[in-house]
């Protein structure tokens, strides 16, 4: 049990390579995916890479990258095999020099001799000659358009249109030989933009922006298209998940406008290790997968690459049956800009909404009893000798305790939320607030003069309910979903509030049952991250029905806010 704007389909046409393309005839200003309410993968052309395909009807592929010295053949082969045995479908190997690129032949020979046929990808930076060697050996090469034909000088200058055109012609001369080699040898290519390594030319004209990232890739993509070469995968990586998500969305929007359909490789640069790396990757990659964007995934952790594969697999496997979700009402007009971050306008209720950072609400409702020790996992340490609370940087702001009561003095920064009937017997206690169902809230039940938490799902949101919320300066919504496509349903609810100009603050609530620790981290990050990236939440509430891991839930809640750059706690 997991409790707590769409548009019609596109017309399609074909280009000269015979692939189905999205028509720009119906393209809306926000459009970057088939639907914001119905799960559907964005259709891309199938690109052949060795014995597997990416895009089209192929499943979402998972891949990783070796960390060994490419000249250490034995170590690279051994690590590659470990990755493949862990489920890695493409193995990327760095080739920083021509010598490294040449050694890919021996690495490939030994991997094939061991009985493994996973395609190899050469990762190229700065060295066109290495790329041209590698393209004759491996099944795919990755180039970074920010440094393939440019050296970073950090020059600040204004380019005239003529000077810019000269720069593009210089790039064409450097890049075209690789394109022709790839075309001749049947080698695929990833044009992979990195937010941190845009060329001086791009930075001076477009800035360090998603628009600059997209244009950086398009400069190289246009050259490929001029050569009638289409075995291309694109990526827009960044360590900032807001920038990463916006860049991929803008990339798809621009491709739709052009009638292009190249598959996408998803990843967050240098996500980190442990829980933080998993949260950051899930928030960024998950935000795109939720909207049907992405044909291959690499989760970049500072761990051995074989440990990245189960994380990537766990992310993509959530979408195997997603198309069967319950219907969600479509949206006539999308009230947000998906290509930039702007927080939804909400009124201030205590320290929730408006200018305040999103709050974290703990769930203690399933505990047998609540004592001082119950708050330890949620960032509060009680010192018996000093008879005082010590508050950490990751201390929850509110705790939902259900039908329970508290018989000790709570920390000065903590608010307590109780079910309404229980609160009525405790309403004299400081910083104790009621939790309402829609029925009780609209039925005239007694309210707190400052803060009233009201539970809602999308089907609850009728005109009478919205009108009541608009007129109540003390109301805060705790939103939930019972839909398998839950993030989209909660986004639809938030769009409705924006459209109806209802400024009630919203705490995003999700509940999880008996799932593993890793699944809890990945699922909650994927479910809540996209909403926070779009500025749509004023708080988070993770209900772990399994119980017994409150410290993990607390770290995850704060980690999601940190990863989405909405609240810094470390």
Where do the PLM segments sit?
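Extreme N-terminal basic, low-complexity initiation segments
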Residues: 2-8
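Intrinsic-disorder-associated, low-complexity terminal segments enriched in Asp/Asn/His/Tyr and depleted
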Residues: 10, 15-19
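N-terminal amphipathic alpha-helix/helix-capping segment at the start of soluble metabolic enzymes
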Residues: 23-65, 70, 179-185, 321-375, ...
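Active-site beta->alpha loop and helix N-cap motifs at the rims of alpha/beta catalytic domains
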Residues: 35-36, 41, 73, 84, ...
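Structured core elements
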Residues: 48, 53, 61-64, 92-94, ...
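N-terminal glycine-rich anion-binding loops that anchor highly charged ligand groups
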Residues: 48-63, 68-87, 91, 97-100
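Short, glycine-/Ser/Thr-/acidic-enriched flexible segments
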Residues: 54, 59-60, 67-69, 148, ...
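Catalytic alpha/beta core domains of metabolic enzymes, predominantly
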Residues: 159-175, 179-180, 201-354, 361, ...
């Amino acid at each position: 049990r997991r409790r707590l704007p769409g548009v019609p389909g596109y017309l399609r046409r074909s280009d000269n390579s015979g692939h189905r393309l999205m028509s720009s005839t119906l393209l809306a200003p926000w459009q970057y995916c088939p639907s914001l309410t119905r799960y559907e993968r964005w259709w891309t052309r199938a690109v052949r890479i060795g014995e597997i395909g990416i895009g089209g009807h192929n499943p979402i592929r998972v891949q990783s990258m070796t960390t060994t010295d490419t000249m250490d053949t034995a170590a690279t082969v051994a690590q590659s095999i470990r990755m493949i045995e862990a489920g890695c479908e493409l193995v990327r190997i760095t080739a920083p020099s021509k010598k490294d690129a040449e050694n890919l032949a021996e690495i490939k020979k030994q991997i094939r001799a061991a009985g493994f046929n996973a395609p190899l990808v050469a990762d190229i930076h700065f060295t066109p000659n290495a790329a041209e060697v590698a393209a004759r050996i491996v099944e795919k090469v990755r180039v970074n358009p920010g440094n393939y034909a440019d050296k970073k000088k950090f020059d600040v200058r204004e380019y005239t249109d003529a000077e810019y055109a000269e720069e593009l012609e210089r790039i064409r001369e450097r890049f075209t030989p690789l394109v022709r080699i790839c075309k001749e040898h049947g080698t695929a290519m990833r044009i992979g933009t990195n937010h941190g390594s845009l060329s001086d030319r791009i930075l001076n004209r477009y800035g360090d922006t998603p628009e600059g990232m997209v244009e950086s890739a398009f400069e190289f993509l246009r050259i490929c298209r001029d050569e009638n070469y289409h075995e291309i995968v694109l990526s827009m990586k960044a360590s900032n998940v807001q920038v990463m998500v916006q860049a991929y969305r803008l990339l798809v929007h621009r491709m739709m406008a052009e009638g292009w359909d190249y598959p996408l490789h998803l990843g967050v640069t240098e996500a980190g290790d442990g829980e933080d790396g998993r949260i950051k990757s899930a928030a960024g990659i998950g935000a795109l997968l939720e909207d049907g964007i992405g044909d291959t995934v690499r989760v970049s952790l500072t761990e051995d690459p074989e440990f990245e594969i189960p994380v990537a697999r766990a992310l993509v496997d959530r979408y195997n049956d997603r198309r069967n979700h319950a219907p969600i009402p479509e949206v006539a007009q999308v009230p947000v800009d998906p290509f930039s971050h702007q927080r939804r306008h909400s009124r201030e209720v205590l320290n929730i909404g408006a200018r305040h950072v999103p709050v974290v609400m703990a769930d203690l409702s399933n505990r047998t009893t609540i004592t001082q020790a119950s708050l330890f996992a949620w960032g509060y340490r009680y010192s018996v000798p000093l008879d005082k609370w010590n508050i950490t940087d990751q201390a929850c702001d509110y705790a939902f305790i259900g039908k329970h009561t508290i018989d000790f003095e709570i920390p000065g920064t903590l608010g307590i939320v109780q079910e309404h009937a229980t609160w009525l017997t405790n309403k004299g206690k400081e910083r104790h607030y009621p939790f309402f169902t829609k029925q009780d809230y609209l039925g005239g039940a007694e309210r707190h003069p400052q803060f009233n938490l009201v539970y809602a799902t999308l089907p609850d949101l009728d005109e009478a309910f919205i009108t009541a919320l608009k007129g109540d300066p003390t109301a805060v919504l705790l939103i939930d979903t019972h839909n398998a496509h839950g993030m989209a349903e909660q986004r639809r609810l938030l769009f409705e509030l924006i459209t109806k100009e209802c400024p009630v603050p919203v705490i995003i609530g999700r509940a999880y049952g008996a799932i593993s620790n890793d699944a809890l981290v990945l699922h909650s990050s994927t479910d809540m991250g996209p909403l926070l990236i779009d500025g749509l939440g004023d708080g988070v509430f993770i209900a772990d029905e399994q119980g017994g891991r409150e410290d993990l839930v607390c770290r995850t809640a704060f980690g999601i806010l940190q990863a989405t750059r909405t609240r810094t706690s470390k």
